[in-house]
């Protein structure tokens, strides 16, 4: 999703009900929930566009486990979320990172940004996903920066990059399997290299990949790692592999797609004095952190039984916004209003 149509406003410093740190699916849906609860809000997003990982890493990936969508492209889901939230005109600050916060004597919060702006709100919600993320690389390849973006990729942002190409995909998780099948109709040839003896991704997709292998449509090399690359300038020529048994093979290739995961880093949020567990923020059943009035939702929130999927993040956002309203208006009975009733009133 580009920021076209997004009301990306400059820092105003005006007091709003809720500041949302993070503009991924959870953060966008939290903004919608604010509108549903007649709350003003702002989103602070460090990237130049909303959508989080869906926009930055997987805009053309298809998603199948979001309610009511049999199949939806990641960028399309972000667009739909923004269409839903945008009707309430939330303030959106792009290309700026929340670096610290201060809780004032009156219970409100001030968030300070990397650009030197200050944002004040009555409550605070962190929906920053996994934090900052960098792709895992293969150290044995050395400096490959000259190949990145031309023949070496860590995600698929445009299928066209691989059309008619001989593609080697490294990995055995969900992303590797999804893109093996996703690029199969476009690429001249797809070869999968995986260091383990079996795939770790979703069973259904794994079977599809193995069936394609049986049909001779793709090659799969288990117990094998990439040992080195043969290149010419910024162009990849061959991928040299070595199996655990010592067998070496040279694969002609135009593109190398490393889908072996990302390293996440909470960044400045890790220094905010919140209770953390496994690089995530501990919350209670109201999505409240160890600081009263400060909430967390989505992948960055940790609680027993948590599943890090989009659907859960949307639920987290709903809970967090709802309970933040109780913090903002202590002692006031918060009544639930069905969306159909609210929308009918808005249309009058």
Swiss-Prot record:
Co-factor requirement: FAD
Pfam families, per database record: Pyr_redox_2
Regions annotated as coiled coil: none
Catalytic activities: 2 reduced [2Fe-2S]-[ferredoxin] + NADP(+) + H(+) = 2 oxidized [2Fe-2S]-[ferredoxin] + NADPH
EC id: 1.18.1.2
Annotated protein name in UniProt: Ferredoxin--NADP reductase
Record family assignment: Belongs to the ferredoxin--NADP reductase type 2 family.
Record-linked InterPro entries: FAD/NAD-bd_sf, FAD/NAD-binding_dom, Fd--NADP_Rdtase_type_2, Ferredoxin-NADP_redctase_2
Residues annotated for FAD binding in this entry: 26, 45, 53, 58, 98, 133, 299, 340
Lineage: Bacteria, Pseudomonadati, Chlorobiota, Chlorobiia, Chlorobiales
Keywords (A to Z) from UniProt: FAD, Flavoprotein, NADP, Oxidoreductase
Subunit structure of this chain's protein: Homodimer.
Cofactor note: Binds 1 FAD per subunit.
Record carries keyword DNA repair: no
Single GO term (MF): NADP binding
């Amino acid at each position: 999703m580009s920021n076209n149509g997004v009301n990306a406003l400059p820092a105003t410093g005006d007091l709003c009900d809720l500041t949302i740190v993070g503009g991924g699916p959870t953060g966008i849906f939290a903004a919608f929930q604010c509108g549903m609860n007649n709350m003003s809000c702002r989103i602070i997003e460090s990237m130049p566009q909303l959508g989080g990982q869906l926009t930055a890493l997987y805009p053309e990936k298809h998603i199948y486990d979001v309610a009511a969508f049999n199949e939806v492209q990641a960028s399309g889901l972000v667009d739909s979320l923004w269409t839903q939230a945008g009707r309430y005109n939330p303030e959106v600050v792009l290309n700026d990172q929340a670096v610290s916060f201060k809780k004032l004597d009156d219970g409100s919060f001030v968030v300070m940004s990397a650009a030197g702006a200050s944002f004040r709100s009555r409550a605070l919600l962190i929906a920053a996903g996994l934090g900052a993320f960098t792709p895992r690389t293969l150290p044995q390849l050395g400096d490959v920066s000259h190949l990145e973006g031309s023949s070496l990729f860590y995600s698929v942002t445009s299928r066209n990059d691989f059309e008619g190409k001989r593609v080697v995909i490294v990995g055995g998780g969900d992303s590797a399997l999804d893109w093996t099948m996703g690029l199969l109709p476009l690429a001249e040839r797809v070869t999968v290299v995986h260091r383990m003896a079996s795939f770790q991704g979703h069973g259904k997709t794994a079977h599809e990949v193995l069936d394609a292998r049986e049909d001779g449509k793709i090659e799969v090399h288990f117990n094998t790692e990439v040992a080195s690359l043969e290149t010419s300038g910024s162009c990849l020529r061959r991928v040299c592999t070595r199996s655990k048994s010592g067998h070496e093979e040279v694969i002609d290739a135009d593109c190398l797609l490393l889908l072996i995961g990302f390293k996440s880093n909470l960044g400045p949020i890790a220094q905010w004095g919140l209770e953390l567990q496994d690089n995530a923020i501990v919350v209670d059943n109201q999505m409240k952190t160890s600081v009263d009035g400060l909430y967390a939702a989505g992948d960055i929130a940790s609680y027993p039984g948590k599943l890090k999927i989009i659907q859960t993040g949307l639920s987290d956002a709903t809970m967090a916004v709802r309970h933040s309203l109780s913090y903002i208006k202590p002692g006031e009975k918060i009544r639930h209003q069905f969306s159909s009733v609210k929308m009918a009133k808005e249309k009058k």
